[in-house]
Amino acid sequence: MKHFLRMLIQVCLYFYCKFLWRCMKFVMRKLTGRCELQRICYGTKPGASRTMKIETSLRDSKSKLLQTSVSVHPDAIEKTIDDIMELKKINPDINPQLGISLQACLLQIVGYRNLIADVEKLRREPYDSDNPQHEEMLLKLWELLKPNTPLESRVSKQWCEIGFQGDDPKTDFRGMGLLGLYNLQYFAERDATVAQQVLSDSVHPKCSKFSKIEWEKKKMDKAIGYSFAIVGINITDLAYNLLVSGALKTHFYNIAPEAPTLSHFQQTFCYLMHEFHKFWIEEDPMDIMEFNRVREKFRKRIIKQLQNPDMALCPHFAASEGLINM
């Protein structure tokens, strides 16, 4: 009974707040002569702050046109803007900037939804050792990370040198599918210097603080390191969940002036991989068994950063030099 009453109160409170909000919107329009979309575009700076407010306004609107505008095809955005202007009785000649601002916001909103679909497609595609393209990507990853060490055979214990668990890496991609391989290859290719350093440090990340003699003298546990490829797949999972949950909207809406793409997602993965590596060393874990604790702490820190509407995770990161900060 108590549970039912609690649910009833929550439902009543929801509808009350919704009714109150509509009343406030009506009053504001009468006082300012502008609809909510106009007030947001004219009163909020470009970037995540504006786009997220526009997205909420469109999604919560009672108009079917506005509700569906967040999921239209990119080619239909321009016509959708015209329809919205007509619905709101806004003269585009008198308010030319409004159409431009709305279009920029919709490109980001629709682009984010499409990016989720693209990423999900890669995640759901399993690694297939009979697929020449998949095999080529995997062998390319080895060449990028170990340019001076030939791979003796396709199935080999050498894969452990770059952080896979066994003789055949295909089994390690089960959780994230091709997405994990795409991200690892992107990191190794687009930010080669950092990737090589992270790989080297991952074997024993404290080596930079001690000489080899000191390391052996202190009998340090080499397990303080981690498996580069496995952690890369794990960080891919982190990036994926941040994307699907909407947490990355703040970042993408601030760094992608139009629609965020798969490249933006991969650049974000590079940043997360680099930052996690530094965070791992700072945390100074006792052994690899502390990985889940460190990862969860890192995840919470990233989420906290993304709660800042002005946040852009990697505006100055090497792999992100092509991004434009709005």
Swiss-Prot record:
Acts as a GTPase-activating protein (GAP) toward guanine nucleotide exchange factors like ARL2, ARL3, ARF1 and ARF6, but not for GTPases outside the Arf family. One of its GO terms (biological process) is protein transport. This is ELMO domain-containing protein 1. The keyword Endoplasmic reticulum does not apply. Residues 133-306 form the ELMO domain. It holds the Pfam family ELMO_CED12. One of its GO terms (cellular component) is cilium. GO terms for molecular function: GTPase activator activity. The gene is Elmod1. PANTHER family: ELMO DOMAIN-CONTAINING PROTEIN 1 (PTHR12771:SF18), ENGULFMENT AND CELL MOTILITY (PTHR12771). The lineage of its organism: Eukaryota, Metazoa, Chordata, Craniata, Vertebrata. Keywords: GTPase activation.
